[in-house]
Swiss-Prot record:
Phosphoserine PTM sites in chain numbering: S40, S306
Protein name: Probable splicing factor YJU2B
Species, as recorded: Mus musculus (Mouse)
A biological process term (GO) from this entry: response to virus
Matches recorded under PANTHER family: SPLICING FACTOR YJU2 (PTHR12111), SPLICING FACTOR YJU2B-RELATED (PTHR12111:SF2)
Main location (coarse class): nucleus
Function recorded in the entry: May be involved in mRNA splicing.
Family: Belongs to the CWC16 family.
Length: 385
């Protein structure tokens, strides 16, 4: 039934084909409906598409190529036998009207009023495009032999100039002639690239898992490699490496202690002795006196030097005497006498320190409670038998 819809029309009883001719005349209508409302004036409303970019003169807005309008179309002239049509339309952004018409001579559209064209045209000859041959030139080529000969020479010179380009195009076409080989090469290239991408993705995932990174990694570049080569990373040794280094150091260490200098050993020994003497000094005790113990202190004021101290003093004086000195030199004698006097006093002090230990006196020695005390008896008043 679908193919009969266009034919099944209702004809009223008063319809007379001789009088009305058609149903459109009977209903006083047109098949194009509203688009033919100005058909009596020779104007037909059509859908016009903008052929190029323009600027509206009313609102100064840009109207792009391909925008469609309801335009009034009418015939305004002929170019030879080709009619020239004019289109009038209203801008959709303002109340301005734009008029354009065809240009059969140049195969183009011309703006009559209401807009200005965005100039994007170029010369076909400068663009090395194929130019259309005009009608007069065609007639001249057919009738004038000399003009045809000159035109042939110009064509041959143009061919010589275009020969390298044509040969390059031909080589490119021959290179892409074998479809199967090209398809195989392209698929092989895609497989290699896909494999490389998978390996790179696995490396990135391993690095992200090792460093606990949640950010995506970008592919490295040549600048990144050059910058990384200039840097030196010093990683911290692990606990096992430190233990291994300590054991290696212990193994290669000498079994015997290194010998220290005499000055260091003597200073260390003297400091230890002073600490011991200070620690052994007891607090003074008030219990007991010398009379209670029955001990009489020696009446002599000077403490006699021990034989060892006297020998040391004489030996030190002989060593300090410079060799080759004469008895008659007063300067050397005075210097030796001064040094001898100072050294003698120092030796006496040392001997007294030996008689009375460090931190002790005669009273401390007479005190029996002290650890360094010693009993001294005086028998000068007793009669020898």
């Amino acid at each position: 039934m679908g193919e009969r819809k266009g034919q099944n029309k209702y004809y009223p009883p008063d319809f007379n084909p001789e009088k009305h001719g058609s149903l459109n005349r009977y209903h006083n209508s047109h098949p194009l409906r509203e688009r033919a409302r100005k058909l009596s004036q020779g104007i037909l409303v059509i859908r016009f598409e903008m052929p190029y970019n323009i600027w509206c003169d009313g609102c100064k807005n840009h109207i792009g190529m391909g925008v469609r309008y309801n335009a009034e179309k009418k015939k305004v002239g002929n170019y030879y036998t080709t009619p020239i049509y004019r289109f009038r339309m209203k801008c959709h952004l303002c109340v301005n009207y734009i008029e354009m018409q065809t240009d059969p001579a140049n195969c183009d559209y011309v703006i009559v009023s209401g807009a200005s064209r965005k100039e994007e045209r170029w010369d076909m000859e400068d663009n090395e495009q194929v130019l259309t041959t005009e009608h007069e030139k065609k007639e001249k080529l057919e009738t004038d032999a000399m003009f045809r000969l000159e035109h042939g020479e110009a064509d041959r010179s143009t061919l010589k100039k275009a020969l390298p380009t044509l040969s390059h195009i031909q080589e490119a076409q021959n290179a892409w002639k074998d479809d199967f080989a090209l398809n195989s090469m392209l698929r092989r290239h895609f497989r290699e690239k896909k494999k490389a991408m998978q390996e790179e993705e696995e490396k990135d995932q391993a690095l992200q898992a090792k460093a606990s990174l949640a950010i995506p990694l970008v592919p490295e570049s040549e600048d990144d490699r050059r910058l990384a080569a200039l840097l030196r990373l010093h990683t911290l040794d692990s606990y096992e490496d430190k233990q291994r280094m300590k054991r290696t150091e212990i193994i290669h260490r000498s079994w015997f202690p290194s010998a220290q200098g005499p000055s260091a050993s003597s200073s260390k020994a003297s400091s230890v002795l002073k600490k011991l003497c200070q620690g052994r000094r007891p607090p003074p005790s008030s219990t007991g006196t010398v009379g209670d113990l029955g001990i009489v202190r020696r009446k002599s004021r000077d403490v006699p030097e021990s034989p060892q101290c006297a020998a040391d003093n004489s030996l030190s004086e002989e060593q300090r005497r410079p060799p080759g000195t004469t008895q008659g030199s007063k300067t050397l004698e005075e210097a030796a006498e001064a040094s001898r006097t100072s050294k003698t006093s120092e030796s006496k002090r040392n001997c007294s320190d030996q008689a009375f230990p460090l931190g002790s006196s005669q009273e401390d020695l007479l005190n029996p409670n002290t650890p360094n005390a010693s009993l001294v008896a005086d028998y000068s008043d007793s009669e020898s038998e």
